[in-house]
């Protein structure tokens, strides 16, 4: 994993017990319940640490997720839509998070705005199936990706704050 702060954050996220994906009907309902409980705890912990940085919701089946994430840089809030589908082979296969408006703006992204998590995150996910869930995906996948990519994209002038664009 990463630094001590990251280990602490991840240790406070409840691990999941049910090894089930969307094909597993009744077990999937149990897995979804665990996913929501884990996400709620993670968001509560973030709010308590004054580090609230995303919102997620899903369709009724829990197979399509969407929401917003934001990154604060130089006291300016940069907000992005996020989306992902739960793979049929979940939890063995991690979801691929897309940030559509950043599509094509960084080399660390695949077509369609899917962020690159292969080198660092996917091996970690594979070692922790079925304990890791969507809260872990956000904490160890999207969060670090935003922390590296967004300041770089801002510095290069690839993205600008919405208020600066309207002036």
Curated annotation (Swiss-Prot):
Keywords: Isopeptide bond, Ubl conjugation, Ubl conjugation pathway. GO terms for biological process: brain development; protein K69-linked ufmylation; protein ufmylation; regulation of type II interferon production; response to endoplasmic reticulum stress; reticulophagy. There is a cross-link at residue 122 (Glycyl lysine isopeptide (Lys-Gly) (interchain with G-Cter in UFM1)). Ufmylated at Lys-122. Deufmylated by UFSP1. The keyword Ubl conjugation applies. CDD domains: UBCc_UFC1. The active site is at 116 (glycyl thioester intermediate). It comes from the Eukaryota. InterPro entries: UBQ-conjugating_enzyme/RWD (IPR016135), Ufc1 (IPR014806). GO terms for molecular function: UFM1 conjugating enzyme activity; UFM1 transferase activity. PANTHER family: UBIQUITIN-FOLD MODIFIER-CONJUGATING ENZYME 1. Interacts with UBA5 (via C-terminus). Interacts with UFL1. Interacts with UFM1. Interacts with KIRREL3. In absence of UBA5, the active site is solvated by water molecules thereby reducing its nucleophilic activity. A linker region of UBA5 is required to reduce the amount of water molecules in the vicinity of the active site and elevate its nucleophilic activity. Belongs to the ubiquitin-conjugating enzyme family. UFC1 subfamily. E2-like enzyme which specifically catalyzes the second step in ufmylation. Accepts the ubiquitin-like modifier UFM1 from the E1 enzyme UBA5 and forms an intermediate with UFM1 via a thioester linkage. Ufmylation is involved in various processes, such as ribosome recycling, response to DNA damage, interferon response or reticulophagy (also called ER-phagy). This is Ubiquitin-fold modifier-conjugating enzyme 1. It comes from Bos taurus.
């Amino acid at each position: 994993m990463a630094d001590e702060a990251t280990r602490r954050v991840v240790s406070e996220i409840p691990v999941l017990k049910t090894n089930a994906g969307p094909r597993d009907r009744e077990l999937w309902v149990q897995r979804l319940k665990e996913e929501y409980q884990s996400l709620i705890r993670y968001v509560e912990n973030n709010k308590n640490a004054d580090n609230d940085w995303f919102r997620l919701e899903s369709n009724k089946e829990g197979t399509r997720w969407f929401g917003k994430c934001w990154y604060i840089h130089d006291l300016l809030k940069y907000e992005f839509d996020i989306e992902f589908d739960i793979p049929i082979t979940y939890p063995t296969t991690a979801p691929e998070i897309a940030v559509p408006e950043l599509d094509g703006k960084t080399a660390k992204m695949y077509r369609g705005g899917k962020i690159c998590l292969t080198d660092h995150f996917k091996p970690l996910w594979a070692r922790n199936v079925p304990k890791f869930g969507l809260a872990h995906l956000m904490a160890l996948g999207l969060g670090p990706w935003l922390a590296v990519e967004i300041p770089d994209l801002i510095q290069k002038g690839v993205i600008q704050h919405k208020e600066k664009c309207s002036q």
